[in-house]
Amino acid sequence: MIDDIQLSFGLPSVLRKKVTAAFDGGRLSSDSGVMLLALADRRRRVADRLAVLIADHRDPAHITHTVADVLRARMLAIGCGYPDGNDFDRLRFDPAFKLACGRLPETGADLCSQPTISRWENAPSLREIIRLTYTLVDIWCGSYAKPPRSVMLDIDDTVDVVHGKQQLAHWNAHYDERCFLPIHVYDAATGAPVVVILRPGKTPSGVEVRKLLSRLIGRIRRHWPDTCISIRGDAHYGRDEAMTWCENNGVDYIFGLPGNVVLDRRVEPVADDIRVRRALDQAEVLRGFAETRYAAKSWQQERRVVARIEASASHADDMLRRGIDIRYVVTSLQESDAEHLYETVYCARGQAENLIKQHKAQLSSDRTSCRSALANQMRLILHTGAYWLLLDLRAAIPSWNPLQHTEFATIRLRLLKIAGRIIETASRIRIALASCCPEAETFSLVALKLQPSGP
């Protein structure tokens, strides 16, 4: 009773009745939907596949929390919106999280604590981190029932601001911050993460991009030796070293390319025609396309360059731009015309920014506050594992339901943040979910879809 009085707080009265509240409801959970993520993990086995790669030197007779248990709890918490390990000060007692991790909600042992999580985030060696990162590629390849004929991979980096003296932190003048610039690679067709790699906060060099592509494509070729692979990225990745490697290894590419006076001179006749036609037609915007063969001084050969040329009224008085805006891409693709390559193929890479936003903003993968670069890479791996769980959960939503096309934050709100009371008896466990849940039908259908097919 003393504890209840200490925890109670008042709320506005309703119809002259006093309202008080206290966190004394007992074995309740505000995240009962975590059971859906647990079903997704049982199918994908992300935690188990990662755990076997981390050496555990503890005495098996005295282990309460296996490595798989620790990683699974961490990924489930990230998926439910708890990216901070300190949240386990309370979550370790949550009955829904305990049940999702394979423990009895009342009589079972509590989950691991924050210090245990931190120790295992810092435990993997460099070789283990490399193997764990390669496993992300293996998980993606395993998501296909059979090798695809072709895949398009989107590659991009994102700023991850740091506030300490972490390893690999670097000053970036463009962002005016000390930061990391981790590289994200996604499957353009499915939105699935292929790999996420922590790196210093500076623009990647051509040699760095070449090495990354060499290791990534080499790993993919182990699974799919005959699949046609294409790489799509902005001008950061359109370096001669990377393009030469792609050409020598049967990989197609389409990259952004910075403009210069040589390229502008090559497309000037087309640009002038578009500028004049826009003025004569008094159109607000007129767009056209051109292409040429071009080789920068540092390039070993000429390559196909496509130009998107846009004349608009807003640029008409701009003396520097001469009433025109030109964007270039360089590509090894030869079959399509210039308009299709730019409008359909290259511009579709904008979706990668939305995928990075889900990874970074909605799963808080920028919580890279460990001093060690290896520990921060381990965090990116765990956040990518949580991404897979939410991706599988979204795929299990019926096609007629608009939730199948929503972002992770909405799915978390509608399907994971559901109140429930978990009751453990001698022979069974019952989860009593909120009766007024708006997504009760969807929750049931998703749970059935994610059920394992075996006995």
Placement of each model-derived feature along the sequence:
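Short acidic (Asp/Glu) and glycine-rich catalytic loops that position anionic groups and cofactors
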Residues: 13-19, 50-54, 95-99, 245, ...
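Short amphipathic alpha-helical "interface-anchor" segments enriched in bulky aromatics
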Residues: 40, 88, 341-378, 382, ...
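Dynamic "connector" segments at or just before major functional cores
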Residues: 1-177, 181-204, 210-223, 418-455
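Short, surface-exposed basic-aromatic patches at helix termini and helix-loop junctions that form
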Residues: 243-252
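Acidic/histidine-rich, metal-coordinating catalytic segments
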Residues: 156, 226-238
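C-terminal structured "cap/appendage" subdomains that terminate the fold
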Residues: 384, 389-433
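An anionic, glycine-rich sequence signature occurring as long contiguous blocks
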Residues: 4-22, 252-361, 449-455
